[in-house]
């Protein structure tokens, strides 16, 4: 029950904008501030690896609300040119409004474009192509990497920070196998509810995984695709962090989606759980959330590579 399926009857619905502007932080300003502190950390690692210099041109692919590109301008100064691209017109408008407020609009260009088609950008015209949580959701990653290669000058760099969700999907599949193979587990209502929630947010079998762009690849797959696109001097770091959840309240827990294509727990509960099931789920999970003992984990790939001169 991915968001794209839920909203299929609403042509005006923009799931990417809705996630970045609302569902990512459950509509909570305080939660958003905690999340953005983490986003800043990711963005700085991407920009550190990109080795931005004044006078360069940076392409922020899948720019969202423009955070990465604007961060680049703050670091490299008034001579950095940034090209913002996204498939969401609403997010591009949000990014442009931010640039206007920061008085840097003249340094910026905005294109509605997918990562696989950057035809608005000339061959060998940019110094850095950067992404943060964008390439992971691209269906044809080799085509996107080919476009990155095309627009980069000789000697220029790609720099990414991308989530790897494959293990989350495998965990859902493992939970499904346990339920199907163990009669006692199959009659455990709480385990079944957790499975139904997680399987609405992540694929639960091999076929679903293969067709889900955001979790059908590993860090090694991404490195291989970068090399096959012609890039050299590749460096990949997989960061796996387990930490106390940033979620501080029940409203934040049920309102937050773990990624743009996932429904929130509240959406799953309202559409798939009975009233009694909702009460059971909340009675067990809410105390753990409010005691702030819930642990989260993340797997982020940081990858840089160079187009040879």
Describe the role of every protein-language-model region.
Residues 116-128:
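A short acidic, Gly/Pro-enriched loop at the edge of an enzyme's catalytic core
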Residues 57-61, 65-118:
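Class I SAM-dependent methyltransferase SAM/SAH-binding core
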Residues 142-157:
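A short glycine-rich, Lys/Arg-flanked "PGG" loop and its adjoining helix->strand segment in the class I
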Residues 215-229:
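Short alpha-helix
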Residues 2-30, 34, 233-291:
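C-terminal helical/coil "lid" or tail adjacent to the Rossmann-like core of SAM-dependent
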Residues 127-140, 164:
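A short SAM/SAH-binding and catalytic strip from SAM-dependent methyltransferases
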Residues 1-53, 67-75, 91-94, 98, 159-196, ...:
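Conserved class I S-adenosyl-L-methionine
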């Amino acid at each position: 029950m991915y968001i794209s399926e839920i909203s299929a009857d609403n042509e005006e619905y923009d799931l990417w904008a809705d996630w970045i502007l609302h569902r990512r932080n459950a509509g909570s300003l305080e939660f958003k501030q905690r999340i953005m502190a983490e986003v800043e950390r990711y963005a700085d690692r991407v920009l550190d690896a990109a080795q931005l210099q004044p006078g360069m041109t940076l392409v922020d692919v899948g720019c969202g609300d423009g955070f990465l590109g604007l961060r680049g301008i703050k670091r490299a100064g008034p001579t950095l040119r940034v090209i913002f691209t996204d498939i969401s017109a609403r997010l591009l408008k949000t990014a442009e409004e931010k640039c206007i407020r920061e008085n840097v609009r003249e340094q910026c260009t905005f294109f509605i474009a997918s990562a696989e088609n950057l035809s608005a950008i000339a061959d060998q015209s940019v110094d850095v192509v950067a992404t943060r949580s964008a390439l992971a959701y691209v269906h044809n990653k080799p085509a996107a990497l080919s476009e990155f290669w095309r627009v980069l000058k000789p000697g220029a760099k790609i720099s990414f920070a991308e989530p790897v969700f494959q293990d989350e999907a495998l965990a859902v599949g493992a939970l499904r196998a346990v339920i199907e193979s163990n009669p006692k587990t199959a009659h455990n209502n709480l385990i079944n509810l957790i499975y139904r929630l997680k399987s609405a947010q992540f694929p639960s079998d091999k076929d679903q995984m293969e067709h889900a762009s955001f979790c059908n690849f590993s860090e090694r797959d991404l490195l291989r695709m970068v090399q096959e696109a012609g890039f050299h001097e590749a460096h990949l770091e997989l960061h796996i962090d387990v930490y106390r959840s940033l979620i501080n309240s029940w409203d934040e827990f049920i309102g937050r989606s773990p990624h743009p294509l996932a429904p929130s727990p509240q959406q799953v509960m309202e559409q798939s759980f009975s009233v009694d099931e909702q009460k059971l789920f909340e009675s067990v999970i809410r105390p753990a959330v409010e005691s702030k003992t819930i642990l989260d984990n993340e797997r982020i790939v940081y990858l840089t590579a160079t187009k040879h001169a």
